[in-house]
């Protein structure tokens, strides 16, 4: 069974990846960002999965090559954090092809509703056990 090392993972990442893995791969999670110093944690893994803030430069690519990693998977659409020219011929890099074209508009609408319905004020008040609706309505 192939092993994938996930860097810069949070508990919600683990839950999501474990739920969708269905036992196809062995998954190893690290809270550390992928750097030259932490690349060795992926020893024995076929692939590493990095996040948007991981800097995959020459040093990281060389370190991953030395331990036999063949594939870098990005959990983001952008790839400006990867030295693609240096990676060419050394290691394969795959990324999320695109996000939903509606994602930004949907998020903007959610924020507008948050302001319009005074949701944050309501949240703060209920957190303090103040359930009156005098200011909110």
Predicted regions and their residues:
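Phosphate-binding beta-alpha-beta segment of Rossmann-like dinucleotide-binding domains, i.e.
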Residues: 91-137
């Amino acid at each position: 069974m192939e092993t994938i090392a996930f860097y810069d993972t949070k508990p919600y990442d683990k839950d999501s990846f474990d739920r969708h893995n269905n036992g196809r791969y062995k998954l190893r999670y690290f809270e550390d960002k992928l750097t030259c110093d932490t690349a060795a944690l992926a020893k024995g893994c076929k692939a590493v999965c990095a996040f948007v803030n991981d800097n995959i430069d020459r040093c990281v690519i060389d370190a991953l090559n030395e331990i036999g990693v063949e594939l870098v998977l990005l959990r983001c659409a952008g790839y400006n954090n990867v030295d693609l020219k240096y990676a060419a011929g050394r290691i394969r890099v795959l990324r999320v092809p695109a996000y939903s074209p509606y994602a930004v508009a949907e998020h903007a609408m959610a924020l507008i509703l948050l302001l319009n319905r005074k949701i944050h004020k309501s949240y703060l008040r209920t957190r303090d056990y103040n359930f009156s609706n005098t200011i909110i309505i």
